[in-house]
Amino acid sequence: MNSATDSARPHDQIRPVEIECGYLESNPASVLYKSGKTIVLCTASVETNVPPWMEGRGKGWVTAEYNMLPGSTSPRKRRDRSGKVDGRTTEIQRLIGRSLRAIVDLHALGERSITVDCDVLQADGGTRTASITGGYIALSLAVSQLAAIPELDPPVDPTAVLRDSVAAISVGVIGEDVVLDLDYRLDSAADVDMNVIMTGSGRFIELQGTGEEATFDDVQLAELLRLGKIGIAELTKLQKAQLVTV
């Protein structure tokens, strides 16, 4: 059934995904992540220190920054001025950071910081979910590179640092249909939209569901979650396939 999408894509199918690891020569822990027409560049950078409030606690920190380039949307999105970040950007980068930290053992990381930067090059809906899914791949690449440094003290065990994987997808209710992976057009038409963030092992990290001048019932919620799980499972397979080849 594709009546809700009015397109060739079935309501329970994700958009085409393309992943290119090592996209930047300057940072091997970089990922160009494409979900349909949405394109996000995710990079992970490691520092050998932690924020002042975490010093001496024997654990590391993972955080994220999110930004949309002016040309990523039409009309042009204005740049944040003088380092000031707007409310939407703050909310999204906190979500990305929380989602990534949920699967990281900060003690196993040691007193090191990893910043995952997610820069939206082109936006067509789902930029925050694409940032989380691509950001995890960049994070995994950075942790693997740390582990490859023989003189590192203490050493890093990737399997200890990364306890699981994480991916995110959007779902929504449009008319009578529940739809997976909303692009901008579908998101604009949705009566209800939800972001589903889950681990690769099938545990929930965060759910963000909202009715737009509408409500939804238990049956619709169950279907939203069912489709979300389908999408997460597919994205997890794609993540694993990419990381195996790196």
Curated annotation (Swiss-Prot):
Pfam family, one: RNase_PH
Catalytic activity from the UniProt record: tRNA(n+1) + phosphate = tRNA(n) + a ribonucleoside 5'-diphosphate
Keyword terms, alphabetized: Nucleotidyltransferase, RNA-binding, rRNA processing, Transferase, tRNA processing, tRNA-binding
Listed CDD domains: RNase_PH_bact
Any one GO biological process: rRNA catabolic process
Enzyme Commission number(s): 2.7.7.56
Region (Disordered): 67-87
Lineage: Bacteria, Pseudomonadati, Planctomycetota, Planctomycetia, Pirellulales
Positions that bind phosphate: 88, 126-128
Protein name as annotated: Ribonuclease PH
Entry's family note: Belongs to the RNase PH family.
HAMAP family, A to Z: RNase_PH
